[in-house]
A protein has these predicted regions:
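Conserved structural position within tetratricopeptide repeats
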Residues: 35-38, 68-72, 103-106
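Register position in tetratricopeptide repeats
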Residues: 22, 56, 90, 120-123
């Protein structure tokens, strides 16, 4: 029975990674994610999960490392752009924040929160 449960977890590695993060086991999640990275280096979901984890851990460099890779795959991914916007906002890198806002609005013109950020920065 234990073997079957463990096999189930590892046959869905992204699900296992999310579970580790959800349970707050970040050290194990980083280790597990690093082991998966070669196989999932072009997997949008995996990269976003890793980037989100580093955002939770307040590591802007690693967050951007993964989120920029997501955006290489899908340039107008609103969730990835939003996360990138937040990191650059925290770093006070307003030119990049403006760029992210404009891309988000081009995909979702009803995003009033992003419009407000853009209006505030562009004055």
């Amino acid at each position: 029975m234990v073997v079957k449960i463990l096999t189930g977890l590892f046959s869905y590695p992204k699900r296992n990674l999310r579970k580790l993060i959800r349970n707050g086991d970040f050290k194990e999640a980083i280790k597990f994610g690093n082991n998966l990275e070669e196989k999932y280096s072009q997997d949008h979901d995996f990269l976003f999960i890793m980037g989100s984890m580093f955002y939770i851990l307040e590591d802007p460099k690693m967050t951007l490392h993964y989120i920029d890779r997501v955006l290489e795959i899908s340039e107008y991914d609103v969730d990835a752009l939003s996360l990138k916007l937040r990191v650059h906002q925290h770093l006070k890198e307003n030119d990049t924040v403006i760029e992210c806002c404009k891309k988000i609005i081009s995909v979702n013109s009803d995003n009033y929160e992003v419009k407000d950020i853009l209006n505030e920065l562009e004055g």
